[in-house]
Regions:
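Hydrophobic beta-strand positions that form the internal "hydrophobic ladder"
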Residues: 25-28, 77-80, 126-127, 172
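A structural signal for short, hydrophobic beta-strand segments that form beta-sheets
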Residues: 69, 113-124, 164, 170
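Cationic-aromatic interfacial patches
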Residues: 167, 174-178, 182
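Multi-bladed beta-propeller domains
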Residues: 1-16, 43-68, 73, 86, ...
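Structural motif
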Residues: 36-41, 88-94, 136-142, 180-182
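Residue-level detector of Asp-centered blade-edge/turn motifs that repeat once per structural unit
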Residues: 23-24, 74-75, 121-123, 167-168
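Beta-strand-rich domains and repeat architectures in extracellular enzymes and scaffolds
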Residues: 8-41
Length: 182
């Protein structure tokens, strides 16, 4: 009789996943469990050998479902991450300031799903996000000021499903499926 693979091995949380180097190359972030829930950790890179894992700190404090999607802002000062509530897939976009550890909900809308559309290092204080505020099936593009948190409608969605932005954070193309799904 072959031993079964334990469920924890197949479905449990990984030890570490999604490593991301900061834009300045001086910090490493990754997702790992904290008190049994996946959160984002950050460690300084202090030597040529790599990050000082003993100095790692948890920068998010999720106690429920865990965090799976995150990224650095281009100013090296903050991390962005997506989080839903109870598996509803209405993702909110949050940031955490790595100096103050202050967290902000950048898309505080009930029943709305946020998606990061584009960011660019030439615009470290801005990103484009898709929000389905007006129609649950369509994500309009908003420009988000990462300093003030202000959202400005950039491009309304006329019935497309995706966007392509250039390096100037200007939406240049849209993606729409064919009637046959192709």
């Amino acid at each position: 009789v072959t031993d079964l693979i334990p469920r924890q091995v197949l479905f449990g949380n990984p030890d570490r996943l999604s490593p991301r180097l900061s834009p300045a190359g001086d910090q490493l972030a990754w997702i790992a469990p904290h008190e049994g829930v996946l959160n984002v950790w950050v460690a300084p890179i202090t030597t040529a050998e790599g990050a000082d894992l003993a100095a790692a700190r948890v920068v998010t404090q999720d106690t429920d479902r865990g965090i799976r999607f995150f990224g650095w802002t281009h100013d090296n000062a903050r991390l962005l991450y997506l989080q839903d509530t109870g598996g509803d897939e209405n993702w909110r976009l949050y940031d955490v300031d790595l100096d103050t550890m202050q967290r902000r909900d950048l898309t505080p809308f009930d029943g709305v799903q946020a998606r990061v559309v584009a960011s660019d290092r030439k615009f470290p204080d801005q990103i484009l996000v898709g929000l389905n505020r007006g129609n649950p099936k369509l994500h309009d593009v908003y420009r988000l000021d990462l300093i003030t948190g202000e959202l400005t409608l950039d491009v309304p969605n006329p019935g497309l499903i995706g966007w392509v932005a250039d390096a100037q954070l200007v939406v240049r193309a849209a993606v729409k499926p064919q009637p046959d799904g192709g």
